[in-house]
Amino acid sequence: MTNLITMKNIGKEMANKLISVGIETKEKLIQIGSKEAFHKIKEAYPNACLVHLYTLEGAIQDIEFNQLSDNIKKELKAFNDSI
C-alpha cells in the first residue's frame, strides 16, 4: 500500500484530511475516486473548495491539478456545485 503523500498534489495537510475520513492509501483514493473522496472531505471540512477537488483528481491522474483538461474541470465544478 502506497503512502498518500507520494502522490502529486497531495501534501501533508491533504493527506491528513484524507486519512481522517478513512482514505489512508493511494490505492483507496484511486478506488473511490476524486468525487467521493471530496464529498467525504467536504462533509468533515465544510470549507473545502473546488481546488481541493481538482487536486484529488490530479493526484489520481498523476498530473498537476492545473493540467486537468477543461472538460474535466467543468465536470468537477458541476459536481462541486451540486453538493
Q: PLM features: residue spans?
A:
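Feature detects amphipathic, helix-rich regulatory segments
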Residues: 1, 31, 35, 74, ...
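Catalytic DNA-binding helix-loop module of base-excision-repair DNA glycosylases/AP lyases
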Residues: 13-21, 36
